[in-house]
Regions:
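A short N-terminal helical cap/helix-turn-helix that marks the beginning
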Residues: 97, 186-201, 228-239, 438-473
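Short amphipathic alpha-helices and their capping loops
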Residues: 1-56, 81-124, 146, 200-255, ...
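Short, low-complexity Ser/Thr-rich regulatory SLiMs
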Residues: 98-100, 152-156, 416-420
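Gly/Ser/Thr-rich phosphate-binding loops and adjoining beta-strand/alpha-helix segments
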Residues: 24-37, 59-79, 143-163, 246-311, ...
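Active-site-proximal acidic secondary-structure segment that organizes catalysis
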Residues: 2-12, 123-126, 142-144, 148-205, ...
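Acyl-thioester-dependent acyl-group transfer interface
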Residues: 1-50, 54-63, 293-358, 372-453, ...
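Short amphipathic alpha-helical segments
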Residues: 77-88, 136, 179, 183, ...
């Protein structure tokens, strides 16, 4: 399966290390690049603002997403250099730098991507701890253009490749695309048959379309009304972790834990239960999250944020960049019946997915919280993401892993991941004593709920059968 973990859990082994970073000439070209009137995407803008404010406070915040995989044999450095540079030149998210001040964010863009060059540097033999430390500390910060680096660790009969990318230019889907891009290109080059890669789309064009779409909204637009309805419904109780995490203001240290929720047979049974209830896998996941929240809080309605991959079309689906954006889901608990909750969750999921195109910040640009009659969040948020890695099953042979830096924003991110042969949950959390205890307690409850949903009792089965009959009539 595709591994999800922290940089600290990554096991690249020990051996000679080679890294790829921007050449001095490329940095100079970017420093002299002309100003580009196109603002960053809304995802990038928020990330840049967070990085700017964190730098002023002397704090580190989560930012790095690393894809790593293994390749048999001895690395051909020249071929890997070509593969990495082709990847960077293919995806224009890497072609812009952002100058951030307290008042503005200005983009600068290189007009000829062929002038960008990443060059290899041999660092010699390094131990595993040294490698992890280097990868975490040597990638330039979010406010620097070249906040993405690559590397290889050579072993006796194989090597490990990594691409360590700031979130400014990547998301969960991008991690898989980066692996496919570089790995397929490299394999083609060493075999003497250059890979035929699919067409990509411009991330800059995505940002332009996003700006036009958002700025066209008014208080009478459906997305704005739907966001306001959700905010009013929460009544200040915005999506957050249901268990205490301790004092998260002292440190931004974070942890990541991954455990199995369902084995292969249970995953199939869970999917069948969702379908029989008139929902999909995503509706069942949200129903289970709602039941877990209810066990801790007793809340009658569960509110959550979940990300949507806003890529559209074949070319954009193959493009690296930060396309993922959050939208809200609300699930009434009722009497706790999984089938009913799955249908309600699916209905909310499908009805609100369009809100991923419009950030909630747009609502506040149009009116104040007082004018809208809403109460804003007072604690760090919680996200529940559903990811489907079945399409990456072939990457199992290369031990593909996605690794996050050991930092936390103070809230909780949860990824429910469907693999070819199991379902796992990964949670990133503030690394406090209370946080560690609470997260492990939460996961234990969540595992029990998923397992129970995969083995419905007779009453539940009767209810599903009745619904299925009525639905087919």
């Amino acid at each position: 399966m595709v591994t999800i973990g922290s940089h600290g859990s990554w096991q690249p082994g020990r051996g000679p290390m080679t890294t790829w970073t921007a050449s001095p000439a490329s940095r100079e070209i970017m420093a002299r690049a002309e100003s580009d009137p196109m603002p960053p995407s809304f995802q990038q803008e928020q990330h840049l603002r967070t990085a700017y404010n964190a730098k002023a406070l002397g704090r580190n915040v989560p930012r790095l997403i690393m894809a790593a995989w293994d390749v048999d044999g001895w690395c051909d450095v020249a071929a890997m250099t070509d593969a990495i540079n082709l990847h960077i030149r293919r995806h224009d998210t890497y072609h812009s730098a952002f100058d951030v001040t307290a008042d503005a964010i200005t983009r600068r863009t290189i007009d000829n991507a062929d002038r960008i060059e990443f060059i290899p540097t041999s660092l010699g033999f390094m131990e595993e701890d040294e490698i992890r430390h280097h990868v975490l500390t040597a990638t330039p910060g979010t406010l620097e253009w070249d906040c993405f680096t690559f590397g290889v660790i050579q072993k006796a009969d194989s090597f490990t490749v990594y691409a360590n990318i700031d979130h400014l230019h990547t998301d969960g889907t991008s991690a898989g695309l980066i692996y496919q891009d570089i790995h397929l290109t490299y394999q083609g080059l060493v075999a003497g048959r250059p890979a035929s890669l699919p067409q990509t789309s411009s991330y800059r064009d995505f940002a332009a379309h996003q700006r036009d779409q958002v700025e066209a909204t008014t208080l009478d637009s459906r997305p704005i009304k739907d966001w306001v309805d959700f905010a009013r419904e929460t009544d200040g109780d915005w999506p957050s972790f249901p268990v205490e995490l301790g004092d998260t203001s002292i440190s931004t240290a974070g942890g990541v834990v991954t455990v199995e929720l369902l084995n292969d047979d249970q995953t199939q049974a869970f999917n069948n239960a969702c379908r029989a209830a008139g929902a999909r896998f995503s509706g069942g996941v949200m129903a289970c999250a709602a039941l877990a929240d209810h066990q801790f809080t007793g809340a009658e309605t569960y509110h959550s944020f979940t990300p949507s991959d806003t890529r559209s079309g074949d070319a954009q689906s193959m493009s690296a960049g930060w396309y993922a954006s959050l939208f809200p889901v609300s699930v009434p608990v009722g009497d706790g019946d999984f089938a009913q909750m799955s249908r309600a969750a699916q209905k909310s999921f499908d009805a609100n997915k369009h809100l991923s195109a419009i950030p909630f910040r747009r609502v506040l640009d149009l009116a104040s919280p007082e004018e809208l009659g809403v109460t804003l969040a007072s604690q760090p948020s919680m996200m529940v993401s559903l990811m489907d890695f079945r399409a990456l099953a072939a990457a199992d042979a290369n031990h593909l892993g996605i690794y996050l830096d050991n930092l936390s924003h103070g809230g909780i991110n949860t990824w429910i991941i469907r693999h070819a042969d199991q379902t796992t949950v990964t949670v990133s959390f503030p690394d406090t004593a209370e946080g560690r205890h609470s997260v492990h307690n939460y996961i234990a409850v969540l595992r029990g709920i998923f397992a129970e949903a995969a083995e419905p009792n007779a009453d539940w089965a009767d209810e599903v059968a009745d619904h299925a009959f009525a639905h087919s009539a």
